[in-house]
């Protein structure tokens, strides 16, 4: 009889654990670029900094093409480059091609997959950062506490040649609307 009770307790415990995991973790789902693009139209302001640096004030301007297949985010003021940064995202099939230009270095390109989870958008890709292979995440975290509908844009990396198995913050940009969007 004790064996049956132990087995029943084990099964009950597994059922509880599985129900907790299935209800609390919502899987990220791939989304279309047409859903993502119009969310970032308008003018934004906030602080930006790389990890360990002092934040600087920035302005971000977002343009989405009429067909919603291209998004340009221009980040200016307070960037390390003497010119603004241009982040040109464009839909390419079920992926997103990013071209980054800062007015100083050569253009950089990266291919990403676009996901949505709990109102946040995440672009995930594999590339090279600081001459090291890395997973790259551009996370646009919806700021629910901000009634104006802002975003926290973080640029995260996870080096593939490292034992650390989590993303590390590379840079963050706060985006609070300063002008009506759309």
Residue spans of the language-model regions?
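Short beta-strand segments that buttress and anchor functional surface loops
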Residues: 46-49, 71-78, 98-102, 122-129, ...
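Edge beta-strand at a domain terminus
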Residues: 29, 113, 139-182
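Bacterial N-terminal signal peptides
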Residues: 11-22
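Sec/Tat signal peptide C-region and signal peptidase I cleavage site
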Residues: 24-28
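N-terminal glycine/threonine-rich, aromatic-flanked beta-hairpin/loop signature
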Residues: 56-95
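N-terminal helix-cap/turn-to-beta initiation motif at the start of protein domains
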Residues: 29-45, 145-146
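Bacterial N-terminal signal peptides that target proteins for export
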Residues: 2-13
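Short, surface-exposed coil-to-beta transition loops
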Residues: 54-59, 81-86, 106-111, 132-139, ...
